[in-house]
Amino acid sequence: MTTITTTAASPGMRRRAASFLHRHAGVRLSLLLSAPLAWLGLAYLGALAALLVTAFWSTDVFTGDVVKVFTWANFTDLVTGEVYRTVALRSLGVAAAVTLIDLVVAFPMAFAMAKLASPRAQRWLVIAVLTPLWASYLVKAYAWRVMLSSDGLLGWGYGLTATVVTLSYLWLPYMILPIYAGLERLPNSLLDAAGDLGARGWRTFRTVVWPLTFPAAVAGSIFTFSLSLGDYITVKIVGGKTQLIGNVVYDNIGAANNLPFAAAVATVPVVIMLVYLAAVRRTGALENL
Amino acid sequence: MNLSRTSRTLLRAALVAGLAVVYVPLAVVLLNSFNSDRTFSWPPAGFTLRWWSAAWGSAGLRDALWTSVQAGLGATVIALVLGTMAAFAVQRYRFFGRETVSLVIVLPIALPGIVTGIALSNTFHTVLGLPLGLLTVIVGHATFCVVTVYNNVLARLRRMGLNLEEASADLGADTFTTFRLVTFPMMRSALLAGGLLAFALSFDEIIVTTFTAGAGVRTLPIWIFENLFRPNQAPVVNVVAAALILLSVIPIYLAQRLSGGDPQTH
Amino acid sequence: MRSPRPRFARPSLVVTAALALAAVAGCGGGSSPATGGSGAAPGGGAFTPPKIEALKSLGAGEGQVNLVAWAGYAEDGSNDPKVDWVHPFEKATGCTVNTKTAGTSDEMVNLMKTGEYDAVSASGDASLRLIASGTVAPVNTDLVPNYKDVFEGLKLKPWNSVNGVPYGIPHGRGANLLMWRTDTVKPAPDSWGVVFDPASPYKGKVTAYDSPIYIADAALYLMSAKPELGIKDPYALDDKQLQAAVDLLKQQKQNVGEYWSDYTKAVQSFKSGDTAVGTTWQVIANLVEADKAPVETALPKEGSTGWSDTWMVAAKAKHPNCAYKWLDWIISPKANAQVAEWFGEAPSNAKACAETSDKSFCDTYHATDEEYFSKVHYWTTPIAQCLDGRTDVTCTDYSEWTRAWTEIKG
């Protein structure tokens, strides 16, 4: 694209800078990328790398200082200790269960919001879904504790099930919103066309709606999965005597002052999430967040 | 759309039921803020406004609220800038490692909060020797808030296309003017939506904040966490939550209203 | 933080310094104990603290004092306008108080090592580390007039003194008690055996404190239940003894409904009947009773674990005079009564009992009952040097206890 410059005598600094930028896409790109990449790429990834390095160190037992000598001890303990395997699998299970429940609950809701509600109603519905996000996470968890206690509204008691239910509740809006956005983008004409071709409700869903909103659903699942995987607060509030991997990390940092081991344990959810993200990249979910 | 009547009714019912389930615990919170029993037992023992007046008078609460607002605003501003820049880069250009940028931006929110928290804390304190305080909280929050702005702006840019910007350039506006007068107004609502979500994320965040705040900085979630354990203060926490729920409708509503107000792109 | 006891695994927020500062190897004064040989001697039962002089005489106040304290220890009215003993202190002495609230003992140790603070309210585990690393100086108790009224049972204890030299001023104390619902648990138990009973009739309704330090409670029970193990100090456990405690706790887990680490959880649990029996604090018992639930508490015959915090003065305090004034203030009858009531613990000053707003406060908290507290084993961090003086074995340290606790919870 050419810039038609005006016939002003000598373009000022700003004008020169603007034209320079306009002509050199590469410079524009690097300027745009510099700050975000420095922040997230260098700083954040650097912080993660530093943490990983710590996982290979150990703590002096008496002084509590970190001994910066390379050792596999933390990872050996992690891998050989049966309890860590159990806790990791349990956390994985919880995260998967929460994601599944949220998916099943959120989809019909999002569908009704996107396709069956009037535009005006849609706006209010989105507000209705977003508002609970502002009520403190802690208070919501405690409200569930109250409801689940034996003389509460529901009285189901605490434990793993209670944890799954509460986590599903807490992250539901994070699943509804991306799916709603995805369904909104789905043209009604496609659904009509499917109907014209003879597909009824369920068939349309299975062959048209689901494949097209799959990326959005996966996007939502990233949130629910990750938030559940690392959570240590909710399980302390409604989990009874259960513990998840977040608790193991937390206990080792604070109480035991054993950052190297905590870092080693922390690599477990990190690895899981990286694998998950790699798997979902292909589905295009990352664009739907 | 040919959904049978039953399907429609069922779906609508699912929506209503879902929303009801979402709001019941919030109603419990609201009720408990008037509950004269300090430990939230059910059914509520009695009705009292004591907690609401205690909340009003609590200086600790006001400070925590202000700290949270500051942290939220700081994080949102940074997230807006970084997220927009990254979105422009990814959407408008083709370059090596484009997909990785998306991944890296998502990472802070995809990884468990505790990992982000201890990584950042370790870096601040050990590697950089920075004292932990409000600044480190803002940095921590901004890191995972970037993604919300990024996604909103990205989605908007995808819809926007380049036509209007090219037209503006054809008419003689330089890069900066085009951005100011054409691009920015078209993106306003995306920025607002992203910014609002970023603020909400930061406002309610506790895990990363725990690790980046140090001992002196108290955001609202931290204050809540501390006071949930004090028998005399715990009900005040309910008041805070109830107030937040009621008040939050305003900014959300505004954001929704304004989303419809962008200049149309075609 | 209000909840007084869960220093070890309290869901506390300010964990940052703990982890980060621990990772600072050799930063500042971090690893000084080992240098010069005057620090803690590994393998020895006791240790020789570095030679530091206590303040000789009290001068004029410096106008300011920087404290590291547990939440609730230095209230200035910002949480409840009626709960304020800081402003009266500032008025009386002209020393402005700046308090840094810490969440864990580790954090306190690390904060004190920065040299920025003048005084700290240290728990039994932190205090020894502070002494060993030369971070705190001995306290000249002659300069603290109210010290003479402190209960004898708190003076010159293993966690606040070394070789007869006092390193701090006792703040208060409390015991972990056994609580039970009188409508479900019959007959009234008098032993910790009721929570460790494998065939417990209260399956699913037992509660225990959610922290590795609870292992000491199991060890305490084993001291009388299995004397052949030879446990003398529940915080000094060698591998065999630790394993025995762990096995006991794993067995207990079958009957546990919930592990608790904060007030409202425990209170609510007992009130609703979700929990019928288990470890508790006096303040929790008070709240449950105030809300009309039928419970009783007792200090079981085996004794109990407990805690006692100590105010200590930094070796390199920039405001030592104001620090001493604070120490004297916080154990003065009125202030000590106020903090004990706010916090929920027994005051350290005998005269504080006359100043409490609840006249039976001291009785409820057994403040003057030395016999009661003689059965309390105050919290101390387990370290490799056996705290009971044994030199032929290495004892297990807190990080091992934490791993064990993870294993127990499964």
Mark where each language-model region is.
Chain A
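Short amphipathic alpha-helical coupling elements at transmembrane boundaries
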Residues: A73-D77, V126, S149, N188, ...
